[in-house]
């Protein structure tokens, strides 16, 4: 395979790739800078072992973290967490929010009951198939049916409908008003127990659903007024998928936590200083969120190389 063309070994045919491995491959297949002998040697070197990156720090990881934090993460987000898998990136964003909200409510004892805390999310969302995320995903029954889930508040998704000429085909202000009314109802029902509002800034699996900046700003306002964290799930849209490093930058409406994956190869979250409003948050309390491998060095090396390619070829311009 090469560039945007997939090669089928059985038929010896090439196919235009509109799949990109579930939107996880950002620069095409076998890019020359990925085949460079020096890079290939580095890749083979780190692939020979799989250290526990959360506890064993290597030069390769340090170089990657510096590159990602300075070349991909926008200013104002000093905290990072690395893991394998987009669903687990979202999962740990939720855990960070639950911990933050519990401490905001004065529940600092780790034995405290927090089962009343919930996550507000949208209809037609896809946030993964792991434990917490399964309660948020609601695209098709195939992916969530027969698995026990939490009954967390789910509200209308006010998506833009376009006519054939690109104009608005629906009363989007009315759709947003409906969503906001349902959000108000959810906050009234759950009082001060909504830990976070989570949204994909563009719903992919849910149907290529786009939202206006006005709605994202409304979510920002609710999160600020009701002491909830605003989480943007950019696992599918992030890392220049929209032309900018992160889709939310088109609207200049910053969340508190961003979950990323797919095109970044290694997955994870970056988080703003709002998390530091509570002491002993998950970035300060050792081991509160963790995994054995903390991502993969091979994925980190590949992600760093993608940053080189994107910058060298001006793909973000």
Summary of predicted features, one role per range:
Residues 1-317:
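Conserved N-terminal phosphate-binding loop of PLP-dependent enzymes in the Aspartate aminotransferase
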């Amino acid at each position: 395979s090469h560039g945007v063309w997939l090669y089928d070994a059985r038929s010896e045919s090439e196919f235009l790739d509109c799949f990109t491995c579930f939107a996880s491959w950002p620069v095409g297949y076998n890019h020359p800078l990925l085949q460079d002998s020096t890079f290939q040697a580095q890749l083979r070197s780190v692939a020979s072992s799989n250290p526990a990156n959360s506890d064993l720090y290597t030069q390769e990881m340090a170089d990657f973290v510096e590159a990602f934090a300075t070349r991909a993460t926008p200013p104002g987000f000093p905290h990072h967490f690395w893991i394998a898998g987009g669903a687990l990136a979202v999962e740990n964003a939720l855990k960070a929010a639950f911990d933050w909200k519990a401490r905001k409510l004065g529940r600092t004892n780790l034995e405290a009951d927090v089962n009343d805390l919930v996550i507000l999310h949208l209809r037609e969302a896809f946030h993964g198939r792991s434990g917490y995320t399964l309660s948020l995903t609601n695209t098709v029954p195939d992916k969530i049916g027969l698995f026990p889930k939490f009954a967390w508040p789910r509200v209308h998704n006010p998506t833009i409908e376009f006519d054939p000429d690109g104009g608005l085909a629906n009363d989007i202000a009315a759709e947003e008003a409906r969503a906001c009314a349902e959000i108000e109802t959810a906050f009234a029902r759950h009082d001060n127990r909504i830990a976070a509002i989570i949204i994909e800034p563009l719903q992919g699996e849910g149907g290529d659903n786009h939202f206006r900046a006005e709605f994202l700003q409304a979510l920002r306002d609710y999160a600020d007024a009701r002491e909830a964290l605003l989480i943007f799930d950019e696992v599918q849209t992030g890392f220049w998928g929209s032309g900018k490093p992160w889709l939310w930058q088109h609207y200049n409406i910053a969340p508190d936590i961003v979950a990323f994956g797919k095109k970044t190869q290694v997955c994870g979250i970056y988080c703003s200083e709002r998390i530091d409003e509570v002491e002993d948050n998950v970035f300060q309390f050792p081991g509160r969120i963790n995994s054995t491998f903390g991502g993969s060095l091979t994925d980190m090396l590949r992600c760093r190389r993608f940053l080189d390619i994107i910058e060298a070829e001006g793909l973000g311009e």
